[in-house]
From Swiss-Prot:
One of its GO terms (biological process) is defense response. Pfam families: Cyclotide. It comes from Chassalia parviflora. The presence of a 'disulfide through disulfide knot' structurally defines this protein as a knottin. Probably participates in a plant defense mechanism. Inhibits the cytopathic effects of the human immunodeficiency virus. InterPro entries: Cyclotide (IPR005535), Cyclotide_bracelet_CS (IPR012323), Cyclotide_sf (IPR036146). This is a cyclic peptide. Belongs to the cyclotide family. Bracelet subfamily. This is Circulin-D.
Length: 30
């Protein structure tokens, strides 16, 4: 898993367009 450099505490991952998913309040890429 690679951190996408984005948090998702208050808003969803904007980087989800790059297949980033929220996990433990941080956006990760599989």
């Amino acid at each position: 898993k690679i951190p996408c450099g984005e948090s998702c505490v208050w808003i969803p991952c904007v980087t989800s367009i790059f297949n980033c998913k929220c996990e433990n309040k941080v956006c990760y890429h599989d």
